Amino acid sequence: MDNILVNNKNKNLLDLNKEDIKKSCEIEDKIFHSKTVNDVDLNLNSKNDISSKMKFIMDVPVHLTIEVGTVKITIKDLLELRSKSILVLDKHAGDPLNILVNGYVIATGELVVTENKYGIRIINIIDNSVFKKL
């Protein structure tokens, strides 16, 4: 019969009883007392409930990227890049730019210059249904 390791003691599977399993779970719960989404009572019945329960995530920083274009090159070509090398991207001048949040495209926009700084004017939000629920 196979032996298993439970709480650093070798016990035969048949020797495990409900009390052993309960103790093991209690120890694991004390060590790993993190909660999963299922453990949290979201009770999202109204717009106010959602707002109050989601308030804590509103200050979480996200990484916003404006993608001018992409190019696929070999490692050999990458290693040969030098100052003044030019990479030809897959987009044309004037094409909408992708706006990504944490790597996911959420919108498109166009490049603008304001007060000698680059900016992006939002043209289209890809899917804002998540925001409408808040």
UniProtKB/Swiss-Prot annotation:
Q: Which UniProt keywords apply?
A: Bacterial flagellum, Cell membrane, Chemotaxis, Flagellar rotation, Membrane
Q: Which InterPro entries match?
A: FliN, FliN-like_C, FliN/MopA/SpaO, FliN_T3SS_HrcQb, SpoA-like_sf
Highest taxon in the source lineage:
Bacteria
Q: Where does the protein principally reside?
A: membrane
Mention any one GO cellular component term assigned to this protein in its UniProt record: plasma membrane
Which Pfam family, just one, is annotated for this protein? FliMN_C
Q: Which GO terms describe its molecular function?
A: cytoskeletal motor activity
Q: Which example biological process does GO assign this protein?
A: chemotaxis
Q: How does it sit in the membrane?
A: Peripheral membrane protein
Subcellular localization(s) per the UniProt record: Cell membrane; Bacterial flagellum basal body
Methyltransferase as a keyword?
A: no
What role does this protein play? FliN is one of three proteins (FliG, FliN, FliM) that form the rotor-mounted switch complex (C ring), located at the base of the basal body. This complex interacts with the CheY and CheZ chemotaxis proteins, in addition to contacting components of the motor that determine the direction of flagellar rotation.
Return the similarity comment.
Answer: Belongs to the FliN/MopA/SpaO family.
Checking NCBIfam families in the record gives:
fliN
Instruction: Tell me which PANTHER family the record gives.
Output: FLAGELLAR MOTOR SWITCH PROTEIN FLIN, PTHR43484
Full protein name: Flagellar motor switch protein FliN
